[in-house]
């Protein structure tokens, strides 16, 4: 699909019962974020994955050891190449959040996960052992890029770039609001 058609379909997806069921299965706390994510898509950032940012504490169900799970808010997806530079610039100038263009590389290039940006961590026990649960690379293998492009239903002929936004502070809400505010200024 052309970018605007894919954008309209992405916006409509947020209203579908199947999509909401999938969100509930994956992370029910994201339900309250759907309206703002829909607006972000409407303003030209077709999202393929996101997390709002949270902190939770508890005790492990088997070991009884205390743990703390911390998430960074993040958002990733496609934007028209013509809009991306101003968006990234404004995110860097007008917010305390991060936005980067993610280049596509050959599937043959090794991307060590130890060099990725941590997105979700768990601290367990005393002394605290920190485990990285989810992370994102600063480059995308071509096959992953194409998989995301297919998920967004974008034609290969569309001049789009992959954008990754994240909050450096663990557990903080507000990334989505800042992204939407900057999109309204930039796109």
What are these regions (language model features)?
Residues 7-10, 14, 40, 75, ...:
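Generic hydrophobic, helix-prone segments enriched in Leu/Val/Ile
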Residues 52-55, 78-83, 184-186:
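Short, flexible beta-strand-to-coil junctions
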Residues 97-187:
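Active-site or metal-binding loop neighborhoods of secreted/extracellular toxin and effector enzymes
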């Amino acid at each position: 699909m052309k970018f605007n058609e894919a954008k309209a379909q992405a916006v409509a997806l947020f209203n579908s019962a199947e999509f909401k069921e999938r969100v509930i299965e994956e992370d029910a706390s994201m339900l309250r974020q759907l309206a703002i994510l829909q607006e972000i898509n409407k303003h030209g950032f077709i999202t393929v994955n996101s997390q709002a940012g949270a902190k939770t504490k508890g005790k492990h169900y088997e070991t009884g050891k205390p743990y703390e799970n911390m998430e960074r808010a993040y958002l990733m997806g496609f934007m028209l190449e013509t809009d991306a530079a101003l968006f990234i610039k404004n995110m860097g100038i007008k917010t305390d959040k991060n936005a980067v263009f993610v280049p596509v590389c050959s599937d043959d290039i090794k991307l060590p996960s130890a060099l990725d940006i941590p997105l979700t961590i768990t601290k367990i026990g005393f002394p605290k052992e920190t485990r990285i649960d989810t992370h994102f690379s600063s480059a995308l293998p071509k096959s992953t890029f194409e998989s995301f492009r297919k998920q967004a239903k974008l034609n290969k002929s569309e001049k789009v770039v992959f954008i990754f936004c994240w909050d450096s502070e663990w557990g903080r809400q507000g990334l989505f609001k800042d992204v939407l505010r900057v999109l309204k200024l930039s796109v």
